[in-house]
Amino acid sequence: MSIVNKPAAVKAGTGKGLTIERIYTTAGVHPYDTVKWERRDVVQTNWKSGEVIFEQKGVEYPEFWSVNASTIVTTKYFRGALGAENREWSLKQVIDRVVLTYTKAGKEHGYFATPADAEIFEHELTHMLMHQIFSYNSPVWFNVGTNAPQQVSACFILSVDDTMESILNWYKEEGF
């Protein structure tokens, strides 16, 4: 099997890409400006001993986000070592890391009919993520927007041929 590098389906800027319709957002208004943001401390403790096992103070979330949701995102998806200067501290940074990476790739590969369509795509995704209408799977949050190429799917599928040898090898590889 060989992998062929194909050029983008549509040359960027030709106007032949996707036209995106606004559903949740308003032209000229960034989604972040439509909600009230607050700073909060995220603290996790050992349920038996009460010992603090994680703490990041002053993280930023929309005020309507639950403590549980902000704890999960802060402890699992913020990039950077805890206490390091480059550690993410706001949901805006996490959303931007992913959404801006996908929007940039879409622009580079001609997925959008116009620059306005790219902005609508960015704003709609930002709104939906901020309002928890949908979420990406963990590998996207862990890896998109990082310097090294990473896997962004939640599972790795091994191909299997329609032969007994291939099927048995699949079992061996999968650890059954």
Placement of each model-derived feature along the sequence:
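Extended catalytic cores of very large enzyme megasubunits
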Residues: 1-176
